Amino acid sequence: YRVIAVDQRGHGDTDWADDGDYSLDSMQADMDGVIEGLGLDDFNLMGHSMGGRNSFIWASRHPKTLRSLTIVDTGPETQRQGQDRIRNFRELPNNLDSFQEFADRIKEYTGRTEEQVLGALKYSIRQTSDGKWSWKWDPATKSRGRTADPKWPVEKLWECVQAVDCPSLVLRGDRSDIFSEETLAKMGKVMVDCTTETISNAGHLVQGDNPVDFITAARGILSRVNR
């Protein structure tokens, strides 16, 4: 498969928003621009967490465009416990003296091995001009997670998943405190041609916690729709 991995605004290597706008509407506009700019049509869309929500909203806005949609550990509703845990983690000091300090923090947060952490962390942090290390994401994105986007209430998000018209796969980590079993089951009932699956030995960061089973599940839907 040809894979295009997009960093959304304020994340990864994509620029920070000059106006601090990290609303769902702004991210939908970014997705429109990327997909149109690359000339994508009849393709498979996959997103995790924030990216998963952005993906199912985009899919609902563009019927008869996708070959498949994969949503990873998110839905129209998320659990307060997990939201608070992530928010508290993101509120920790964002300017550390060494790469290893970041690695130790991530190991404590995720329970992953040193090898797993070091393999992913190098893409997520950067060294600043003063020699310290910080996350690549814009600190302004922290405010996005504190309150729901008023233009996108839960009821509207449920309407979005019900409007998705392509085959879909919804994955949940069995230890996730963000995405509940009840929401997973409901999505499986209300979405058209939807398969749901729980990935064992995984929290919210499904693809990093159990990459083997995640890839197996992802390849399953890709194989089915790309024959």
Model features per residue range: what roles?
Residues 2, 39-44, 65-68, 167-169, ...:
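Structural signature of beta-strand start/N-cap positions in the alpha/beta core
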Residues 4-47, 216:
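Active-site loop/oxyanion-hole signature of alpha/beta-hydrolase fold enzymes
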Residues 8-12, 76, 203-206:
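Alpha/beta-hydrolase active-site loop signature
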Residues 14-20, 80-83, 181-182:
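Conserved catalytic-core motifs of eukaryotic protein kinase domains, centered on the activation segment
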Residues 38-80:
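Conserved hydrolase catalytic core segment
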Residues 74-137:
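Helix-rich cap/lid subdomain of alpha/beta-hydrolase
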Residues 128-190, 195-198:
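Conserved serine/cysteine hydrolase catalytic core
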Residues 192-227:
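Catalytic active-site module of serine/aspartate enzymes centered on a nucleophile-bearing elbow/loop
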